[in-house]
Amino acid sequence: MVTIKKDFIPVSNDNRPGYAMAPAYITVHNTANTAKGADAKMHAKFVKNPNTSESWHFTVDDSVIYQHLPIDENGWHAGDGTNGTGNRKSIGIEICENADGDFEKATSNAQWLIRKLMKENNIPLNRVVPHKKWSGKECPRKLLDHWNSFLNGISSSDTPPKETSPSYPLPSGVIKLTSPYRKGTNILQLQKALAVLHFYPDKGAKNNGIDGVYGPKTANAVKRFQLMNGLTADGIYGPKTKAKLKSKLK
């Protein structure tokens, strides 16, 4: 059973624009990289590079799936401009074609993933589209000639992959605003978890305010999260806030 690994692009990267997205389409790509070792893990490393301008949601190879963005954020993968439907309303999936991999298995894994995403986001099969739809690029180059067969494979792929738990550990205990401000790894863990859910300590600042310090802006991010999730909005992180964060990070 293939595993989905969440390995998100840092929120500070330019290729993680952070625009909210309600996905209406799923866009399929081939990586067009046949080099040995050009698997999902390598592409996960590439897309996190601060100098990379493109971004997409998933990369699939013959043994694993890497997720690079939350599906409620857009990526830059469709080539139809800043406000294009492909970029702003579609989940981007890259299928690896590395020479030392099994492309047919990677394609099968992608079909399972697409089926899963269709169910979770109420996306019909006729909105699973090739990259070519948005920009005219001959992509996914290895699937275009038998696109209908690829779609038929999605319809018959009813066993979705196993998804791993998110890699965002949460601190225990109670954390609140104090003087002097509390600092440490536990604060950093909390800030990263909040940022993944779009409750940034200081969006637009360096690393969106993720600095390991529980100051007023981080307390405000906690308060905003609590307010939006039916908790007492006091800006104090405790067991109830931890439990709610954990449920949202699944």
UniProtKB/Swiss-Prot annotation:
GO terms for biological process: cell wall organization; establishment of competence for transformation; peptidoglycan catabolic process; peptidoglycan turnover; sporulation resulting in formation of a cellular spore. One of its GO terms (molecular function) is N-acetylmuramoyl-L-alanine amidase activity. Residues 45-141 form the N-acetylmuramoyl-L-alanine amidase domain. Pfam families: Amidase_2, PG_binding_1. CDD domains: PGRP. InterPro entries: Amidase/PGRP_sf, Amidase_domain, NAMLAA_amidase_2, Peptidoglycan-bd-like, PGBD-like_sf, PGBDSf. SMART domains: Ami_2. One of its GO terms (cellular component) is extracellular region. It catalyses: Hydrolyzes the link between N-acetylmuramoyl residues and L-amino acid residues in certain cell-wall glycopeptides. It is found in: Secreted. Optimum pH is 7.0. Its main location: secreted. SUPFAM superfamilies: N-acetylmuramoyl-L-alanine amidase-like (SSF55846), PGBD-like (SSF47090). Disulfide bonds: none annotated. Induction: Expression is GerE and sigma K-dependent. Keywords: Cell wall biogenesis/degradation, Competence, Hydrolase, Secreted, Signal, Sporulation. Residues 1-44 form the signal peptide. Its EC number is 3.5.1.28. PANTHER family: N-ACETYLMURAMOYL-L-ALANINE AMIDASE AMID, N-ACETYLMURAMOYL-L-ALANINE AMIDASE XLYA. Autolysins are involved in some important biological processes such as cell separation, cell-wall turnover, competence for genetic transformation, formation of the flagella and sporulation. Could play a role in mother cell lysis with CwlC. Belongs to the N-acetylmuramoyl-L-alanine amidase 2 family. This is N-acetylmuramoyl-L-alanine amidase CwlH. It comes from Bacillus subtilis (strain 168). The lineage of its organism: Bacteria, Bacillati, Bacillota, Bacilli, Bacillales. The gene is cwlH.
